[in-house]
Amino acid sequence: MPIIQFGEKDLLRGKVVLPAWYRMRIDEIGEAPSKDGGSTNYPVAGTILHNADDGSTDFAGVPIDWNFNSKAIGFAVGFLEAFGVKAEAGKRFDLNSAVGKELDVYVENGEYQGRIVNRVNHKYRAPR
């Protein structure tokens, strides 16, 4: 008999949040080739701590995942700047240095395969 068990994050993964700025902790940043092998994906996993504007914890604990891609790496500039890092041409950056740190991320709602999902459209700011 197959037996499964859920963790707290599993139960919150599909929860759709209200569009807003959220304080988020970066839990993990990975690196993997894209499906076609023509670029590299950098998946980011974060967890909402609270609403960054009003402090509400209604969506605390909700995991949010998004991605950077080597073919459009310019979208990572705002992410780095939110940590006080100045992006410069030719300079290399270790995305893993963001793991465990906090920043404010604007989370929107979007549609994916006919359902409403949380979406990060690369709007970042330093915590206020």
Describe the residue ranges of each PLM region.
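Short beta-rich binding modules
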Residues: 1-128
